[in-house]
Amino acid sequence: MTTPLDTPTREPLPLAPAGPGKLVMSAPRRGKPPRHFVDLEPAERGPAMVELGEKAFRGKQLATQWFERLEDDPARMTDLPAASRTRIAEALLPTLLTPIRTLTADGGTTIKSLYRLHDGALVESVLMRYKNRDTICISSQAGCGMNCPFCATGQAGLTRNLSTAEIVEQVTAASRALARDEVPGGPGRVSNVVFMGMGEALANYKSAVAAVRRLVSPAPDGLGISARGVTMSTVGLVPAIDKFAQEGIAATLALSLHAPDDELRDELVPINQRWKVGEALDAARRYFEATGRRVSIEYALIKDINDQAWRADRLGKLLNARGRGWVHVNPIPLNPTPGSKWTASDPAVERAFVAALENRGIPTTVRDTRGSDIDGACGQLAAIGPEQPRA
């Protein structure tokens, strides 16, 4: 039975318990990761070499090896003095991510990597090869403090923030695998980076934004990825969105909305209790005005919870009230998570939801979900170690 667009009903909300985490904005204090060359701003690299007794220009040489040539073996960095390589590596190239498990799907073109950090914390990233691009979904925190009840990461709670280098190294590790032809499809290089893995990136603002700068800065200062290929996802930290808009980077902003009404979003996305739907959308519009980059609205479709056509219509009205041509909606079929009783919307309901948005003139594309069979899709990253049983 369908509900007319103009007669919304109040459904009971069979929401999951809050789980182990509450809404956490500040990461727990833990020992800092060792300083890595990637943590240094370009202007700091020469002085760091001088501290080691080397010439300042060695900083640029090391940057060329790391970012441009994707070299991680000091023995092959032949433009650095052989007698200095070990000392430089020990001081500036500590191991940050230790791979402990790799799972593949889609004929080997979707790869989920589980890494152990220096303190035992676990994070995951997912590399996805498409015909015209190579995209990696990366983590900005170990765990997440946003406590969204339909997301495996949010239910795990927040362990700690990642450093700039820990974030970037997920990308360089994937780029090395592509460059060395270790992934089906021939040699390649990461072209797109989405901050949609574990964590709320804007809650780890300093490290996440510094990581974006390393990604988009031309080699040898960084990896030289186009800012258009970088997507910063957020549940709606309004002050941080406004701050990011002024960074001069012009990456794509993705707002994880999941409901157009405060009553439901308060439950699905607890940060909404601090910044309401209207405030988040206003900030997203300001981001568009500051950067010229069209904003993506992410909307996980949950059966009988938020997938009603009238909610799509309400969302369309809210977006159009803030102008035309500034936004695109990505409905996402809900991916299953361990212990969750929620499921994805029926295909007919999904089509009706999309049609309601399109009837309001809102560009809408259902997200191509990959990696769900290896718990590598949106909302599924939980960094379960090899020794931990799956639910």
Swiss-Prot record:
- Cysteine pairs forming cystine bridges in this chain are C137-C378
Record's family?
Belongs to the radical SAM superfamily. RlmN family.
Q: State the top-level EC class.
A: transferase
Q: Which HAMAP family match?
A: RNA_methyltr_RlmN
Q: Which residues bind S-adenosyl-L-methionine?
A: G199, E200, S233, S256, L257, H258, N335
Which of this chain's residues are annotated to bind [4Fe-4S] cluster? C144, C148, C151
- For bias kind Low complexity, which ranges apply? 12-21
Q: What cofactors are annotated for this protein?
A: [4Fe-4S] cluster
Q: Does the keyword Membrane apply?
A: no
Active site at E124 (proton acceptor), C378 (s-methylcysteine intermediate)
Q: Which organism is it from?
A: Kineococcus radiotolerans (strain ATCC BAA-149 / DSM 14245 / SRS30216)
* Record-given protein name: Probable dual-specificity RNA methyltransferase RlmN
Give the gene symbol: rlmN
